[in-house]
Amino acid sequence: MEILDYIKANCGGKLFAIGGVSFGGQIAMELLSIDRDIADKAIIDGSLCIPQPRLAKISIFLVSLFGKLMFSKFSCKLQLSMMNKLYPKLAYPEEIKAYYLEDLPKTPIKTLVTIYKTYMGRYKLKDTISASKAQVLYIYGEKELNCVKASAKLFQQIHPNTILYEAKGYNHGYLSAYLPQEWIDLVVPFLKSDSLVMCNESDIS
């Protein structure tokens, strides 16, 4: 993996912490599975590690059929406009809006299909995750799909040094994407805790 090669070449082969949301969380899981010493801490948010082929097929069908419309520049502008009106406190900064309008419409449908195939349809947690030395904070929203909640529980079963945190009232990735201060208040105590000692959800909330 290019990420692992980069860490070995530029970071002495180890990081203090790694993390990711959704598909990014799968990448973090994979790194932990490949190298038990890659990080002291890991934060995973709303990630699947149990394949969902049916959900993948539905998502791929919709993206293949409507992707060009859903991710056109006009649609992206409309989405940002609606966010400004409906959720003004959650609106993106101007710099992020510019990237959103520039990058998303250029994303090939083939790339989106590949992401859905990997994220939903194929990725399965490896047993080697049990050897990882990292302490993990696994966040998921209360309103997540059941398969995401099941993935979190499976991860904890295989890698016991894991804290599960259910973000009450929130959907997929909502806490990290839209409530940065609340996310920081949750994560900082976890990062400051002793990585060699198990702690409970109550210790970081």
What are these regions (language model features)?
Residues 170-181:
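Catalytic histidine-centered segment of alpha/beta-hydrolase-like enzymes
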Residues 132, 138-140:
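Short beta-strand/loop motif that positions the catalytic acidic residue
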Residues 1-15:
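Conserved acidic catalytic loop of the alpha/beta-hydrolase fold
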Residues 20-24, 28:
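Gly/Ala-rich beta-loop-alpha elbow adjacent to hydrolase catalytic centers
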Residues 53-55, 73-128:
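Conserved alpha/beta-hydrolase catalytic His-Asp/Glu region
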